[in-house]
Design a protein with these regions (language model features):
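Soluble non-cytosolic domains of exported or imported proteins
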Residues: 146-150, 166-173, 194-201, 215-218, ...
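A short, structured surface patch at a secondary-structure boundary
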Residues: 59-156, 162-168
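N-terminal export signals
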Residues: 7-25
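Structured C-terminal subdomain patch of bacterial secreted/periplasmic proteins
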Residues: 194-219, 303-378
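Extracytoplasmic ligand-binding site segments that recognize negatively charged/polar headgroups
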Residues: 95, 103-105, 109, 120-131, ...
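Flexible, glycine-rich surface segments
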Residues: 237-314
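Bacterial Sec-exported substrate-binding components of ABC uptake systems
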Residues: 22-105, 216-243, 367-378
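Proline-aspartate-enriched helix->loop->beta-strand connector
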Residues: 152-168, 184, 294, 298-304
């Protein structure tokens, strides 16, 4: 069968592995098997990873930004010799995980995989997910140090099978290197580089593949897509929205226009007031604005959403204005249309549909109540 160029490029990782396996087969032990490419795992939104599936149930996960590759083998699969350098083998079941990336915890909870995690890079008080905090308080998950200062002795004593980091670890590459020297595989997940909320949630398929729970991952993801889809079919509301916090040094921290929060505001039917702020090349999703610039851009916004994650929640208008006196002149403050995110917002990474639905209700209802992520600032 003649392959198109696209099919060839998609199959290339499989071809490379197969050739490597064939080259080694002459001297390989009897339990060595070649990997035969079967199909590319379908992804609808995520761009930061790919998955190539092979006969027998093995899957090659590739992080597109870094090029790192992980070959996930079923528990009873034969060893594969002659793999290209840099391919890390993960044999199922993957257990005793050291989880540093907080945004991954919610995906594990939706996969009913909390028991796969033994160690956390966040202390119990830092979790805004009840199940994670309870597991730590009960001793089922232990604190093993943050990303830059892990407790290597504890990690080794726990027979850690995998460390899951986010890209913060790139600031301390020696930590990743040390974990790998100890024989601990490290996945630096890149969901934060996805600009679409649906792409971020689709990372549940990455973990579903790794844990052998692909079907559940697909079901959970599809449910979230179906919850958002009706809103995407509605006309825009014509209203504007700002998402921000005031920093301790009197700057306004806002999301860039290409960020996933800005996209969720658009999905809900509003126009994000700082949509013209673009990525300056530092890969950060936020930027700090002088208060005068924030005032000019957000003064007439119909809705203000205060991000509680860094500076804490605000409950009253007085608390908000105490952070920045200029806010008293804002239209949304004067009309009583200011909301504050719950502190679990960024940790509940599989519930982004709830934020879109919440904001749509804020935009279209007079006094919405029972919202998941938004609380009124009164």
């Amino acid at each position: 069968m003649k392959l198109t160029r696209q099919q060839f490029l998609k199959a290339f990782p499989a071809s490379a592995l197969l050739l490597a396996g064939c080259a080694a087969r002459q001297t390989a032990p009897a339990n060595t098997e070649a990997l035969v490419f079967d199909h590319a795992y379908p992804l609808d939104y995520a761009q930061q990873f790919t998955a190539d599936c092979y006969e027998g149930g093995s899957t090659l996960l590739t992080l597109t930004g870094s090029g790192e590759q992980f070959l996930v083998l079923p528990e009873d699969a034969a060893e594969v010799d002659g793999l290209p350098a840099g391919v890390t083998v993960l044999r199922q079941p993957v257990q005793d995980i050291y989880l540093v990336s907080t945004s991954v915890m919610d995906l594990f909870l939706h996969l009913d995989a909390l028991d796969c995690i033994t160690l956390s890079g966040t202390q119990a008080a830092g979790w805004h997910l009840d199940e994670a905090r309870a597991a730590m308080e009960a001793g089922r998950i232990a604190y093993a140090g943050k990303y830059s200062a892990p407790d290597y002795e504890q990690i080794l004593a726990s027979n850690c099978g995998l460390a899951i980091e986010n890209t913060m670890i790139l600031h301390t590459p020696e930590v990743k290197e040390q974990l790998e020297r100890f024989g601990i595989p490290v996945v630096v997940e890149r969901s934060s580089y996805e600009s679409s909320p649906l792409a971020r949630m689709e990372w549940i398929k990455f973990w579903g593949i790794l844990l052998g729970r692909e079907t559940l991952a697909e079901q959970v993801f599809q449910k979230q897509v179906e919850r958002i889809q009706p809103l995407l079919e509605q006309a825009p509301t014509g209203k504007t929205c700002a998402f921000f916090s005031i920093t301790a040094n009197n700057l306004a921290n806002v999301r860039k226009g290409g960020d996933y929060v800005a996209q969720m505001i658009g999905m809900a039917g509003a126009d994000y007031v700082f949509s013209d702020l673009t990525d300056s090349g530092n890969n950060l999703s936020t930027m700090n604005l002088p208060l005068e610039d924030f005032y000019a851009g957000a003064k007439d916004a119909d809705v203000l959403i205060y991000n509680s994650t860094i500076e804490g929640m605000v409950a009253t208008t007085d608390e908000l204005v105490a952070k920045c006196a200029l806010l008293a002149d804002f239209r949304a403050v004067q009309s009583g249309n200011v909301w504050c995110t719950t502190q679990s917002f960024f940790q509940q990474s599989m519930e982004l549909a709830d934020f879109v639905i919440d904001l749509h209700r804020v935009l279209t209802e007079d006094a919405p109540d029972g919202l998941h992520f938004l609380t009124p600032v009164t």
